[in-house]
Amino acid sequence: MIIIGEKLNGSIPSVAKAIAEKDADLIRERARMQAEAGATYLDVCASVEEDVEVETLKWMIDLVQEVTDTPICVDSPSAKSCVAAIPFCKRPGLINSVSLEGDKIDTIFPVIADTDWECVALLCDNDGIPDSVERRMKIFFGIMEKAKQ
């Protein structure tokens, strides 16, 4: 089973406060605790304005890597921010996430192709998350087809 630690996310009020105040100790401690609890990956999501997102992701990723070798799961709604954060990671990890919604998949797949990076795939498209299994499977196969390209 793959376990992704999700407690380094700026949408969590205490983490948002730590990011705003540059409280490195809170970020390090959350990373250490999740790694010790057995997380396979540590999701890092800044949830800040796009103009400071990459530098904030770098700050957070650097702090996480000070206390653990657990691979990073780079998380942002912005494909450009995800791609920009990859070089900050000491080892391959995950991109969270790709789907058939928008063009994020077309930005991320070429960058992680032929690398050891992987991604979380969401079974949704521009119409949202389908109700039917058949439609979800169609999206799944669409994602897999893009991965082959």
Language-model-detected regions and their locations in the chain:
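Glycine-enriched alpha-helix->loop->beta-strand junction motifs that scaffold or abut catalytic
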Residues: 38, 87-94, 113-119
